[in-house]
Amino acid sequence: MEKSSSSSINPPSLSGDEIREAFINFFVQHNHQKLASSSLIPDDPTVLLTIAGMLPFKPIFLGLKESSTPRATSSQKCIRTNDIENVGRTARHHTFFEMLGNFSFGDYFKKEAIQWAWELSTEVFRLNPQNIVISVFKEDLEAEQIWKEVVGVDANRIIRMGAADNFWSSGATGPCGPCSELYFDFKPELGSDEIDLEDDSRFIEFYNLVFMQYNRDLEGNLEPLANCHIDTGMGLERMAQILQKKSNNYETDLIFPLIKAAALLAQLEYETTNKKNKTSLKIIGDHCRAVTHLICDGVSASNLGRGYILRRLIRRMIRHGRLVGIVQPFLPQLAEMAIELMKNAYPQLLEKKKIILNELKIEESRFLETLERGEKLLAEITSHECDLISGAQAFELYDTYGFPLELTEEIANEKGISVDINGFENEMAKQRKRAKEASVSIDLTEEGSIEREISLFDETRFEGYEKLETTSTVIGIFKNNESVKQAVQGDLVKIIVNRTPFYAESGGQIGDKGIITSQDLEVSVENVRKKKNIFIHSGIVNTGVLEINSSVQMNVTPSFRQRTTSNHTATHLLQSALKLSIDSSVSQRGSLVSNHRLRFDFNAPKPLTIKELEDMEVRINQWINEDHPIQIKTMPIKEAMAAGALAMFGEKYGDVVRVVDVPGVSMELCGGTHVTRTSQLGTFKIINETGIASGIRRIEAIAGPSVLDYFNERDLVVKELSKSFKVQSYEIVERVSSLQLELKDKTKELIKVKNDLALAKALGLASYAKSVGKSKLLIRRLDGVDGSGLQSAASSLIDHLGKYSAVIFGGIPNQEIDNKLVFVAAFSPDLVSDGLHAGKFISGVAKMCGGGGGGRPNLAQAGGSQPQSLDLALEKANENLTQQLS
């Protein structure tokens, strides 16, 4: 293949859509199957988001799955946030980007891949060969030879690179191989003598060809693969920059309309505004595409995993919007434009438009509520002459105001201030410790101190799928976390046996309960956990003597297992119902399966409606009545994933997995216990639905025998209420509503009485006001009055004292809660005109008592938590205000 004549080269200015279409069509003409982009939420539970064009094909490259076609081509949407600090600041970093790719699965190899890459670049996109530089792995002489002798590239334009740059691998072991990259040279007139591909002002990599030809073993040796593969990637945004002759990716038609729209909202001219504003506008444009696609693919904002990535991007958009002067909500408006820009390539954006705009509206509203307060605190911190934001300050911003640490760092860096990251991590660790200590309870399964000894035992053989009783040998006894030969009546013990029917706590399902017996021995088993497949049975010796090496009968309580099993199968049905009734993108975020109930956490942007919950109940109970069989299968993980089995993100799975299949209803990877037919569940009932974090909802439900218990308990409550209120059951709601209205009226009366008392008490203090120059100042401690009462009293005193008057109150509103203080400041209009500000003043007073607050210039309230400092704080307030009024 000869190089094209440079004189005939005139690269067309193609739109982003046209570039995508030209790439796909080129490879379709070369017998590649066109594949749609996969979701940003990958099937691989070990990966958070789709970060590369080849990720959907990873199971094929790793030999875990057969390809349905020998050749494929796609435009894959991707998200990366590892270089988020560079987004908007460099010409080519993005969070969202599209990777155009052509792939061979054991079909063609280097020669065809290289020839087609050159043909596409020079004949379809009509790039001048003089503008193209090739990199190859320094040991890949075959690829270098093809470039020189088959394609005809000048040897001076072929650069040999090391393994760090031009050798791809999927990990420490597995498929790998050299790669070759195509770079566009913006300044070919500089010649080929000293080419530095790291110079991104001159070169941009636009096409990467990976030749998967080796397998690396545990010793690091490279063995040739029986079938070699091709994996390529061309950045759509980069090719758009080249063909549209732009200085950076952001000014292409893929992103620039969003940037211009953001500039319009900020009342800025992008072309003439300063560099800082341009950076913020680029960040907004980039992130807008990312958040739109993330929500479309089912991600909801939260503080965990991919939900945290979405929340972080949304908050960065809002933050940079404010930096350029956009103070009103704007995300839905911009996302609507993003949908319009990308709807041809991704029509699902139109289908999910309502969901996308609603999620952005909710999340923007939430953040705006806290952002202003957080920004004020951060501004106050950085206004003082300091070069470091302490870990405690950064943590307060994170914990109280919802500021991600990265956002605090970004704002601080703009002001040339550092953030104490280690201090922040220490504060975070303290909070985790406090949370852990707050949840400590008596626990018979605290096996941490005996873990080393337990690890010496052979794995326990679990027989609980087939039976609830088995004869076993005691191979380990632990009492007070020490290994012993025997245990007697009353001893709390941990027991290890060679085989067991007891299910050990895992996968969200709690451990079984039951008894261990032999002759005079009886041990109550209260819980079972496992360490590396060694089952630890925790309980108490009721009678007899438990001895090492003795033969015992292991008995799981049948009713306990039945209830737990019913709730576990119901959990699978619930997840399927959620996907069908709410959205197919709903995914599990956590679960608990006990003998009493089930709990299922999932992503959702808003609470479920009563109708949605009712529809799911009806659907699940219909499945129960249809008496579906539950099929348990063990199969290779690649086979299970290919069949559509659901996997829990973050869980680690082996090569062979257990699949729980309700044909036509549900299929999940699961190691838990289940009923054999859905009819055994009897009935399913949702008892609660609530939010546990932003974007995360929780459903609590029951199935099987627990449903009857639930209705019996409710019936008892209704009867007790009927008896107490002396009404029929159907009259209870009306009676409670009447009492609530009565209570509301009485509460209003009580507040009025308290305010009247506070006012009378305060007016009695008017004589204590002192004259300071032409002003009157009253500062007093007033306990037993809440904030609203103090504000009312202070306002009345200002009216009573007249011009140039100031009133400061501080006190303990409730003597039963002596660590809560309230402060109020009121200034007359003339003092406000002279520059005094009640909000700022009272905030300073409250800080002396470990608190804070603020408000309007004429009236403000603050709080505190250190009553021992109250009197001193009021004295200081007197001194400061006297000095100001003088």
From Swiss-Prot:
Transmembrane segments: none annotated. Binds 1 zinc ion per subunit. Zn(2+) binds at H568, H572, C670, H674. GO terms for molecular function: alanine-tRNA ligase activity; aminoacyl-tRNA deacylase activity; ATP binding; tRNA binding; zinc ion binding. Pfam families: DHHA1 (PF02272), tRNA-synt_2c (PF01411), tRNA_SAD (PF07973). It comes from the Bacteria. Its cofactor is Zn(2+). It is an enzyme of class 6 (ligase). It is found in: Cytoplasm. GO terms for biological process: alanyl-tRNA aminoacylation. GO terms for cellular component: cytosol. Consists of three domains; the N-terminal catalytic domain, the editing domain and the C-terminal C-Ala domain. The editing domain removes incorrectly charged amino acids, while the C-Ala domain, along with tRNA(Ala), serves as a bridge to cooperatively bring together the editing and aminoacylation centers thus stimulating deacylation of misacylated tRNAs. PANTHER family: ALANINE--TRNA LIGASE, CYTOPLASMIC, ALANYL-TRNA SYNTHETASE. Catalyzes the attachment of alanine to tRNA(Ala) in a two-step reaction: alanine is first activated by ATP to form Ala-AMP and then transferred to the acceptor end of tRNA(Ala). Also edits incorrectly charged Ser-tRNA(Ala) and Gly-tRNA(Ala) via its editing domain. HAMAP family: Ala_tRNA_synth_B. This is Alanine--tRNA ligase. It comes from Prochlorococcus marinus (strain NATL1A).
